[in-house]
Design a protein with these regions (language model features):
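Surface-exposed loop/linker segments characteristic of extracytoplasmic
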Residues: 1-278
Length: 278
């Protein structure tokens, strides 16, 4: 991540995208953009970042990357059946990642990007922040956390949910997919994304789904403020907590018992809080 920033003078966007941010306007996830910096130059050379992920060679979509897999979770493939709307062949399996990018302490999505400054994390769709934007301090700001998938992590709908959707997939998500589940393209889809937030406690089970509601695309309010969007919670297969990467490159194990105000403060980059990662 920091090697990418050293080259480009910015962090990668959580997902490379352009207005109006429809499904075909999202081209590559932050993970895809950083492949060369993970010593995956050969895989990166086969990925056309000018095209959506579902138009990439099938061999690329199915290629697991060891650095993206937590040893406590193990490789989880991801069925494409819910993506048949974009013409993917039945039976194709996506390789997944156990690590997701911090949206901060908000679960809002909006195309105007007018989020309250105090709740924003260092990654979102279509925005690439500079390190100097992280005024809370790089060592005090979460960049990524664990986003485990597999049968232990079913998904439910809406903040505060606990009952898994019986028809939904588990919380696994493809490493190359920067798209957000939306109610226009995939109206019946209940799943996650490449992003996580601290609106809810880590390791909440069932995992809250990620969803952008097209009719509210200009509403930057979080669910606490009456907004209609969702972002999934962080989760891991480590007992009692999860691993998080801060913006200075340090890794910290946070426990499930962390005080929520402190947890949220660690996830924001310009909230003005005085906190220190344990």
């Amino acid at each position: 991540m920091l090697n990418y920033e050293s080259t480009h003078k910015r962090l990668p966007p959580g997902a490379q995208a352009r207005p109006p941010y429809g499904p075909s306007d999202v081209k590559a996830s932050a993970t895809t953009l950083m492949l060369p910096y993970f010593e995956e130059g050969a895989l990166s050379s086969r990925y056309d970042v000018s095209q959506p992920y579902w138009l990439q060679p099938h061999a690329v979509l199915e290629m697991p990357v060891p650095i993206f897999t937590c040893p406590s979770n193990g490789f989880q493939s991801y069925s494409n059946e819910v993506f048949s709307i974009v013409g993917l062949p039945s039976g194709l399996q996506f390789a997944t990642s156990d690590y997701i990018y911090s949206r901060g302490a908000t679960d809002a999505w909006c195309i105007t990007f007018r989020y309250p400054k105090a709740v924003v994390g260092p990654f979102t769709i279509g925005m690439d922040y500079r390190l100097k934007d992280i005024t809370d301090g790089q060592s005090h700001t979460i960049a990524m956390g664990e986003g485990a998938g597999g049968e232990r992590w079913p998904v439910c709908q809406k903040v505060g949910c606990t009952t898994a959707d019986p028809a939904g997939p588990d919380a696994s998500y493809p490493w190359m997919a920067g798209n957000l589940p939306g109610d226009q393209m995939l109206p019946n889809y209940v799943g996650t994304s490449t992003f996580g937030c601290t609106m809810e406690a880590m390791n909440k089970r069932a995992v809250t789904n990620t969803l952008i509601v097209a009719a509210s695309a200009t509403n930057c309010d979080s669910s606490e403020a009456g907004g209609s969007h969702n972002v999934s919670n962080f989760r891991s297969d480590h007992p009692g907590g999860a691993q998080f990467l801060c913006c200075d490159g340090s890794v910290h194990y946070l426990t499930e018992g962390i005080e929520m105000a402190f947890y949220r403060a660690l996830s924001t980059m310009a909230g003005g809080e005085v906190v220190q990662a344990p």
